[in-house]
Amino acid sequence: MKDEQKQEIILYGYRDSLMLYDEGLSIDDIKEVLQLYEERELYLTCAGIKLAIDELIDKYGNDTFRN
């Protein structure tokens, strides 16, 4: 797999996670999504999801429930 393809998969996980957050999922919910991808060994997507989680925690804190 080419580096461009790998980067595209990582960005997919990142953007999709941010979209899920914008649609109302909590960071904990997104962590559960991450576990599902880890179980399926889709590690490039996991990398993107982890980037999004880290960014969301930095920006909003580690919310268990959305307000």
Model-derived segments and spans:
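Boundary/linker segments of alpha-helical solenoid repeat arrays
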Residues: 59-64
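Hydrophobic/aromatic side-chain positions at a characteristic register within alpha-helices
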Residues: 38-41
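Short, charge-rich, low-complexity alpha-helical interaction segments
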Residues: 1-22
